[in-house]
Amino acid sequence: MSEIRALIVDDSSVMRKIVERSLRQAGLESLVVHEAGSGAEGLEVLKAKPVDLILSDINMPSMDGLEFLRQIRAQNLAPGVPVVMITTESSEEHVKQAIQAGARGYIRKPFTADQVKERVLPLVRAA
């Protein structure tokens, strides 16, 4: 698989590293990772750098992941780029909101590398 550029957005630096490690364990060895600690920071990264995949938490201060996703779509910052929400939010309402906002996948924390592989690799291959 060729180089994959991923943006990981989470207010926890530890969680960003866990997501990155899980992506590599899922088979994305040639991974270039851009990190953002908030939705607003994520938007700035997208304005400056092209990406192939976006993974975002929902619960973040100032701009939550759903608003981040809505802004990506409204500003046309990453057309066609799959977005996967990775979050502790597990209600069906949150899943529905994420899908309606444009998410292509949803992973509940805590998660395993196998779950990341099952949900992310098909999106990367299809992109």
What residue ranges belong to the model's regions?
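Active-site beta3 strand of CheY-like receiver
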Residues: 49-55
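Active-site residues of response regulator receiver
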Residues: 57, 87
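C-terminal output helix
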Residues: 111-121
